[in-house]
Amino acid sequence: EEKAQFLILHPPYDDIIKFSDKKEDLSNCSSTDEFYDLFAKVAKNGYDMLEKGRFAALIIGDSYKNSEVQPLGFECMARMMALGFKLKGIIVKDIQGNERAKGKTANLWRYRALAGGFFIFKHEYVMIFQKN
């Protein structure tokens, strides 16, 4: 049986952006707890497919819901560690300016944040794990 040499997980950030109408899509979860549960299943599939000793990367940010930060990155990190992944490093990636690269303006996101009562995050995490 062939195994993967490297695993990259870059899940949607809870329900911030809907990517499809499929019920299996993590962006369509009805709650943050459901998102965490389904993410854990995806991570388990990846763990099983990854060759022993190889690495995985989780790229994720946080969300803001009900007037508080939802620490998606750290919650998903904990689920990966519970599967047996060993955390090797955390990189905090500056994402300021990404909206301009996508043809959007920073003012649009600032307006949406003020109108919608949410916080604009300017970072995301790149977490590196190893399967032992």
Positions of predicted regions on the chain:
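Class I S-adenosyl-L-methionine-dependent methyltransferase catalytic core
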Residues: 1-132
